[in-house]
Amino acid sequence: RRAKTDKKDAVKLANYGLDHWLTLPRYVPEEDTRLLLKNCYRQYQQYSKVQTMLKNNLISLLDAVFPEVNRLFNSSPRADGSEKWVDFVSTFWHCQCVSTLPLKSFSARYLKWCRKHGYYFSQEKAFEIHSKAQSCISVMPRNETTKLLVQQAIAQLKATAAALAALKQEMQSLAASLPEYPVVMEMFGVGSTLGPQLMAEIGDVRRFHSKKALVAFAGIDAPPCQSGQMDIHSRSISKRGS
């Protein structure tokens, strides 16, 4: 276990301040936009963890009433955070909601559901869902208590997804007002979600004197390892950034 270094660090900082008293740049508070962007991202991270937990909880419940129904749909989440499989199980919350219907009746009902929620209808998908429901073995009965458990889990997940979508939109709006936004968005692999997150974590990039300072701030620099004639170039990253 490493010894505590709080006092030693405080002395180091004090000595550094005394040595560079005349050359240290004046502290400038963070801009309101950057501060809000950073806090939005912090909340986004927290809600993302909650969403993962709630999604796992819902899938666990569905394994007892309609196993693997979430794997029948592969549509990407919408801009408002809604997902097709979540909307589907909100209506067809038990495998018997599908298996007790003839294929023709279920197809008609599924078509009506797709039109209501704005999803594409596929007869092959209707047949696949119906076949899956016919082969499912549910552990929990089809009653009001089971329906309450599933729909409450869905309601919590939808609320969290909506909050994430709102935060993402606000982060995008805040990031777009900053001067470095066009440069960040032109980077390879950076999209509408990652771009604002990078800007939130880095802050004002103009405060770094070089690209090496930015790399060290991110904690992905490889510190030197030299002693006498030894000079190791292959090093792991420090992970000691902000």
Predicted regions and their residues:
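A detector of single, family-specific signature residues
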Residues: 1-242
